[in-house]
Amino acid sequence: MDTKEEKKERKQSYFARLKKKKQAKQNAETASAVATRTHTGKEDNNTVVLEPDKCNIAVEEEYMTDEKKKRKSNQLKEIRRTELKRYYSIDDNQNKTHDKKEKKMVVQKPHGTMEYTAGNQDTLNSIALKFNITPNKLVELNKLFTHTIVPGQVLFVPDANSPSSTLRLSSSSPGATVSPSSSDAEYDKLPDADLARKALKPIERVLSSTSEEDEPGVVKFLKMNCRYFTDGKGVVGGVMIVTPNNIMFDPHKSDPLVIENGCEEYGLICPMEEVVSIALYNDISHMKIKDALPSDLPQDLCPLYRPGEWEDLASEKDINPFSKFKSINKEKRQQNGEKIMTSDSRPIVPLEKSTGHTPTKPSGSSVSEKLKKLDSSRETSHGSPTVTKLSKEPSDTSSAFESTAKENFLGEDDDFVDLEELSSQTGGGMHKKDTLKECLSLDPEERKKAESQINNSAVEMQVQSALAFLGTENDVELKGALDLETCEKQDIMPEVDKQSGSPESRVENTLNIHEDLDKVKLIEYYLTKNKEGPQVSENLQKTELSDGKSIEPGGIDITLSSSLSQAGDPITEGNKEPDKTWVKKGEPLPVKLNSSTEANVIKEALDSSLESTLDNSCQGAQMDNKSEVQLWLLKRIQVPIEDILPSKEEKSKTPPMFLCIKVGKPMRKSFATHTAAMVQQYGKRRKQPEYWFAVPRERVDHLYTFFVQWSPDVYGKDAKEQGFVVVEKEELNMIDNFFSEPTTKSWEIITVEEAKRRKSTCSYYEDEDEEVLPVLRPHSALLENMHIEQLARRLPARVQGYPWRLAYSTLEHGTSLKTLYRKSASLDSPVLLVIKDMDNQIFGAYATHPFKFSDHYYGTGETFLYTFSPHFKVFKWSGENSYFINGDISSLELGGGGGRFGLWLDADLYHGRSNSCSTFNNDILSKKEDFIVQDLEVWAFD
């Protein structure tokens, strides 16, 4: 027994050992926590805890070695964060809640919003309508990933009581995370704020409304003004909206044709799935002409539009041409950025940047130094490049010049830029201008000494620049180099720029830029100048210059643009005449003068130097343009001054391009009723499925980009590439040169009669005996074989071949409309109504649905009326409306519109009426409008 007890004491059980290990582990954890809290790093505390239990010393020592390593690594981190914990660790509970919050995305309510809980019946559209906001805005406001919401979901909606009327989706928008820690100001108090942000800021998902993900990467719809070429009903202006799913056209309600015929005739909508081909052309040579053979088509058809220099690729290669299109657009942008470059690749400084520098009075320099500068400028005018540094100091002269430059160049930057270096050709002229400015800004006594040399230098430079261009072969450049003042004294205009169009367009540009100026005075100046001669212009200029006022309202200021560049930049003006809008690069730029002395010095020098030399060259070739402008001004002066401003139509001189949309079936009328929109595909079968629109040329690239992005397989595809030939008419058409193309068509669609004719090569007539009449069960009391045969031919294909079963007959079931409804309730197929009146006339209708009681019209476009009085006629759906079938307790109606019914029967199936209705455009089916029913049958197909 003793041995057994000793064994028990010596050998402990498994659970006892496990319990001791667990207890030792807990003691080690508490010891490490105490060591971390005190930061002493001593081991005595841990050993004291472990002394009572001597059996577990080895196990605890293993734990302690691991804890020492962990403690050393943690102490380094804790020492770094000791300073930070003063600001963040308030208590343990708050830290625990912070740890939980770090795992969640904290959403702050935006300004001007309130919370709304979605109900069972709420949808995103209904909530948006309730709070006067668009659904897309609501999705953006709540950062939703779908338009689907669930009951109980909390959404942010605009608050009507909030003072902020607009919702600002900024950094405080929903989705922007808010850190649960302290503010940024507390971060700045720390010795290392960046370290604090990196160390303690939780890892969170930041959703900002200004991020690139929120911005739409592609255009989701296009909206533009265009004109629709209708089929024989004129051309209507309207708005086209193109989306990835639909193409819509809404006519302008103010269009004369819309006022006359209504908007129902011109509103169109077409799903993108029904579009066969979309193409853009420069003309309408591809437009189909009615009753024209293929050989009559023009041979020089306009090629398909491609942006830039894109070659007309094959259809299988241009499925996704994004890369090349982007590269072409990039080249276009580079070309637009280099429009200030001339044909000979010499840079031209824009006017504002060159004239915006203010001439100042140089301090510390004498008159001799300025005259030396002027002499050196004459020496370097034709040769080496010069470096000029223009001053920015203000002066009285510069203030007036700045205002003129800013008004003439409204679209450019107003900042003044120092011109550090220019090219060789441009630098000479610029240096001469700067030197001339410095000389003119001298004191009066200094100016008198320099006037003679200024006159000589100006005359010499003007004569040299003008005579240098006399030898050129280009007349346009020659006339651009001529002096403007001399041409004005001779009452002559320079050559019209090729890029500016007609003289009318240049005058329109003048009036457009100077909208804030006195336009009446401008036009009076033009007219009086042409009548009284050049002396008027001299007097006007002298008075304006002597007064020191701004000379723009009078139209006297000579404002210059870049030059005769091939880039076609818009020309700024303000000259005495509308065509004087540019000079050659070699000429000195104009200077705004404030005194009559300065004006006379320059003016007399220019006039005397070039008046005799350039008289004939300016006068000969420009009289036509002057007379055109005179006539145009005389016509425009008769209208109010508001009408002188150019309209949008006048500004856009480029012709439109033409958009051709080919569809598989005619487009639906967007303003038609819902039922008509569903069944409109059955009507107007003879209408060609091709629609033409005139679109603005500036929106053509947008259209092309949109189609290539959303429907790349549609643009430019021809219908024949798909292997189908759209048959638009029911009868056969003669196809010119059908057999000239060997084996290009694998199959064709023909009528039943043509197939029968081809069965026998020697048959020249149709064998009508081969037609098998449908089986009628039971035999009809009203229809004979002749009636059945003719009706069977006109029935839709989906019911041909089925036996006819009698569903209702007045001879069997009695004369009651309710009985007819009851017998037709079990049917699930189209029905044929046959009526025989007291005049023994047989007529009726084919209905796509069984007759039933309904509170609205039903049926499809396959419904038709027929009569055998006196000959067999079928009246199909006209497409005007969708009043096919309407079943009521008191009557049964087929066709309607305008209070007239194609066929009407009373509740007793005894009295009836037939009128011409707009649904079928039918004749009266019976001999008289009102008739009495003798017998009636309803046949089903099953």
Curated annotation (Swiss-Prot):
InterPro entries for this protein: LysM_dom (IPR018392), LysM_dom_sf (IPR036779), TLDc_dom (IPR006571)
> Where in the sequence is N-acetylmethionine found?
1
Residues covered by region (Disordered): 1-46, 161-188, 324-416
**Gene Ontology CC entries for this record:** nucleus
Where are the coiled-coil regions? 4-29
Q: What is the protein's known function?
A: Enhances the transcriptional activities of several nuclear receptors. Involved in the coactivation of different nuclear receptors, such as ESR1, THRB, PPARG and RARA.
> Highest taxon of the source?
Eukaryota
Sites of Phosphoserine modification = 89, 179, 183, 208-209, 211, 441, 500, 502
Any idea what this protein is called? Nuclear receptor coactivator 7
Please give the subunit comment from the record.
Answer: Interacts with ESR1, ESR2A, ESR2B, THRB, PPARG and RARA in a ligand-inducible manner. Interacts with the heterodimer AHR-ARNT.
Which residue intervals are annotated with compositional bias (Basic and acidic residues) in the record? Answer: 1-12, 369-381
Q: Which residues are annotated as modified residue Phosphothreonine in the UniProt record?
A: 134
List the biased-composition ranges (Low complexity). 162-183
Q: Report the subcellular localization.
A: Nucleus
Organism from which the protein derives: Homo sapiens
Entry comment describing in which tissues the protein is expressed? Highly expressed in brain. Weakly expressed in mammary gland, ovary, uterus, prostate, stomach, bladder, spinal cord and pancreas. Expressed in cancer cell line.
Spell out the Polar residues composition-biased ranges.
Answer: 25-38, 356-368
Which terms are listed as keywords in the entry? Acetylation, Activator, Coiled coil, Nucleus, Phosphoprotein, Transcription, Transcription regulation
Q: Where in the numbering of this chain does the LysM domain appear?
A: 114-157
